[in-house]
Amino acid sequence: MIGIDGYLWSLRGTKVQQPMQCAALLIAGALFSPIDAFGSEVSLSANPPSCSPEQSLRWRGGTLRLENDLFTGSDRNYTNGVALTAVSRDLQGGLRPECLPQPIGLYARFIGWADPGFWRDSGAQTSSQNLVVRFGQSMYTPENKTRTDVIPDDRPYAGLLYLGLAWNRRIHPQAASYEMLDVRELTLGVIGPWSLAEQSQDLVHRARGIERFRGWDNQLRNEPAFQMAMERKFKAYTEGAVRPGWGSDVIGGYALRVGNIETAASTGVEFRAGWNIPNDFGSYPIRPGAENRPPSGVADLRTTTPQSVLAPKPGAHVFLNLEGKAVAWDFSLDGNMFRHSHHVSRWPWVAQAALGISSQWIVAGRGVRLAVMRVWRTREFDQQAGHHAFGSIALSLEF
């Protein structure tokens, strides 16, 4: 890698108290090197080569997702999550960062530097890529809502406000009967009072006439939140926007997440059965990589050639998702990473199951999708009283 040996040599003897400066130097070297992350020279002029519309960022649709344990008759643990997601259209041909808004182009270069194989063959006919931007909030509370002191044997009050940026690559290996979706998502945000979790919960509880939680003064303290998620999913290769008629399929996957939001490795499988199952990579609760809305070269056929056998069609299916993960860090259980705080004895192994139904249809020439699921999660810490359950609703619209 160009220049990295020199950077590492220059960091010899750097004090331990300066890790952020060291990381900044390395990232800057990756982002601003005259050799880009894709192995070719980058134009640094004010007038980059002409960019076609297919190589520029255009928005394809969005998703609003709400998760809450009130759907399952409880009010504790992971108690609420909301996320608003925007998804781009497919970027055709080889990826050109200079054709993208600067922050997104820089992130594409950073991924190519940190994971050189991710953009390999990005211009091949058997691969495509798109971008997902997500803004969301999550909140966690103990079981006892009336106590105003720290509850040592229950999870801390915690909130997270975040912005996520994900690149998705859909790949069909040559002559293979399967296809893959690779995801690289960077999440940045804030933990603590600045997440506005207390205010959000109080607003909802007042509107519904529910007693408010009294212990938010003991929530985790403010600190920056970050996480890098790397995920791969795979399923049988299918042409078109749906699998026509009645059918079923299986989606497998594995992921690694690193950061002070969560550090964990997971693997899972999803089973789907129904009518006109969409040619995507499944339905999941809120987490990095979940709102993948993968690239789909046939999306435009909805309006240009609606009678094509490849075009999107109404349909519905049921799904069952099973996932297991090994957890090394979870801010909602381990507390603040950069200062002492309330925490509990986290379990290193967690399993999760989700059962739901998803339907898609065409309204006024626009694609609409609604997915509803119930999620069960095993105990996450020693003192937890049994498993936890919550409901999830997601409404998606294609522009």
Kindly label every feature range from the protein language model:
Residues 62-68, 133-139, 186-192, 232, ...:
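Transmembrane beta-barrel strands of outer-membrane/channel proteins
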Residues 76-82, 157-161, 182, 222-228, ...:
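Residues that define the transmembrane beta-barrel architecture of outer-membrane proteins
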Residues 82-88, 135, 163-169, 228-234, ...:
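Residues on the lipid-exposed face of transmembrane beta-strands in outer-membrane beta-barrel proteins
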Residues 106-200:
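Long, hydrophobic/aromatic-enriched structural stretches that serve as scaffold segments
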